[in-house]
Amino acid sequence: MAKIIQLSDDLSNKIAAGEVVERPASVVKELMENAIDASSTVVEIDVEEAGLSSIRMIDNGVGIDAEDCKLAFQRHATSKIKDENDLFRVRTLGFRGEALPSIASVSHLEMKTSTGEGAGTHLVLQGGKIISEKKTSGRRGTEIVVTNLFYNTPARLKYMKTVHTELGNISDVVNRIALAHPEVSIRLRHQGKVLLQTNGNGDVRHVLAAIYGTAVAKKMVPLHVQSLDFEVKGYISLPEVTRASRNYMSSVVNGRYVKHFPLVKAVHEGYHTLLPIGRHPITFIEMKMDPILVDVNVHPSKLEVRLSKEQELHELIKQGIKDVFQKQQLIPSASVPKKAPMPAIKNEQQSLTFDAKKGNTNEMETPLSYEPEPLESVVYETNQMSTYGMPVQEMTGASSPVFREDAPSERVHKEESAASLEYEESVLREDDAEAISENERVPVMYPIGQMHGTYILAQNERGLYIIDQHAAQERIKYEYYREKVGEIEQEVQEMLVPLTFHYSKNDMLIIEEHKEILTKVGVFLEPFGSGSYIVRSHPQWFPKGEEAELIEEIIEQVLVEKRVDIKKLREEAAIMMSCKGSIKANRHLRNDEIKALLDELRQTKDPFTCPHGRPIIIHHSTYEMEKMFKRVM
């Protein structure tokens, strides 16, 4: 008796649906991609109970011809590709011909479609089988309603998350597709409540504002670099705007949102030490390339891709981001509380609000008598910021990057007009031009004194500056050590008393395997008995008293990483040395020492953050100070 049988179409579609339709968000993604491929300029999505009850998608695309409607629900039937050559030059979002049959096989599906010429078609399917077909009248476009999702696959239904989680996944998908296609007007509603509305004018800045709020959108700067093979453009947040999750980082390849970790890594390397440890920027990066350089036929979900010349693209993104921030003045401003009537005192914790509007510099009075003579400065005001790296919406408990029903301030059509966003960005561009022309990213500051032996207070005609003295010297020393450590030199310092290090036999095998790498960084290990090494010299740049700890740290990196990145090793060594050798808290400095420290800081390449990404300088403008003291209203 034969053991191998041909699976039925119904069972085959259910198996395929397991890969294509993982959750309601998968249905939304596939239907939106079909709508965009159909040249739609308006797409409306209505969901009930996070899509488990109903998903309704309406578009104004080209529609489907009557003779093609039934075929559209057959597996691997598509209008996107014709032959094998097309498969390697995919220019559409869909191409596999699996979405509609997979969705229909695990739901009740109803479709009305019309090309605008003659009668349209109305199909009703259950479990992938057509149970009703009739002609209908209607405008050009397609309407698809999916209900009772996973009704015939209870195992999949059992593993669905909460309504809030599934709705968050849907919002995430819609938001990223909206970013990838700002030329399409997209509206997402849940239970009749609008979660996202974009205007489809083609300006991605307005989509960013609609998703993250204008306060965040104003703190994002444009990125645009290109090479012979790649064009990279988008918007990246200033280092002061960070999140605890990578979910706020969006990558788009030829109009397709993708998840590709090497691209995320390139962005992080571009920010380098500007980001605090464990924090991530908000970014939207769109990459355009010849379709032959990208393979999208990796997984049925089409989220994964393989890229040719990936290292070239990696370097282009990394260097592009570095170049952007070299032209920016990155001193974050302190926030000013929003003016509001005094609330009644209650026996409960009161929430804080912040003023999102920027002070008008034209209203600033002439410098007060205690200020030095006016200096030319490149400092411009930034907007709503509660603490470094934590914008207001994070403090109010909005943790999801995409679904925040309780954060109306993050919706541009409810907060500020698009004209306001454009005006603010034009102001930032003017300030950038000033910074470039004056070639002075950190203004001259005049020391006032110290606070708690930890923070330096300084001033100029623009207001008050608070400088973390440890972070400032850490940046100075880091750049010094990074240059020294970065040099491949064989100069070593002999030690009067050799150092001994003990390791297990397994660790010694790893060390022996990577001994050549250790030698390149100036660490020479000699076997010394069983399970021990002796070191008689060290690189000349090692600071006195730190030799043993540095050597141990370098060897530990070899043991943990297995494959050692020498550049990363030297980077970590420079960070460690700069941190250990910098001024500690409660160290009181003389005014001449403070002035020397500030002068050295101004000479560094990245004077705004320490090597760990913490801010060095916080700015309180004169206007903000006067507003707090009610000198201006």
Curated annotation (Swiss-Prot):
Name the keywords, alphabetized.
DNA damage, DNA repair
Gene Ontology CC terms: mismatch repair complex
| InterPro entries (UniProt xref) | DNA_mismatch_repair_CS, DNA_mismatch_repair_MutL, DNA_mismatch_S5_2-like, HATPase_C_sf, MutL/Mlh/PMS, MutL/Mlh/Pms-like, MutL_C, MutL_C_dimsub
Q: Which GO terms describe its molecular function?
A: ATP binding; ATP hydrolysis activity; ATP-dependent DNA damage sensor activity; mismatched DNA binding
Pfam family membership, one: HATPase_c_3
Q: What biological-process GO terms show up in the record? A: mismatch repair
The entry's family comment says: Belongs to the DNA mismatch repair MutL/HexB family.
Function, in words: This protein is involved in the repair of mismatches in DNA. It is required for dam-dependent methyl-directed DNA mismatch repair. May act as a 'molecular matchmaker', a protein that promotes the formation of a stable complex between two or more DNA-binding proteins in an ATP-dependent manner without itself being part of a final effector complex.
NCBIfam families assigned to the protein according to its UniProt record, in alphabetical order: mutl, PRK00095.1-3
Which HAMAP family does this one have? Answer: DNA_mis_repair (MF_00149)
Protein name as annotated: DNA mismatch repair protein MutL
Gene name in the database record: mutL
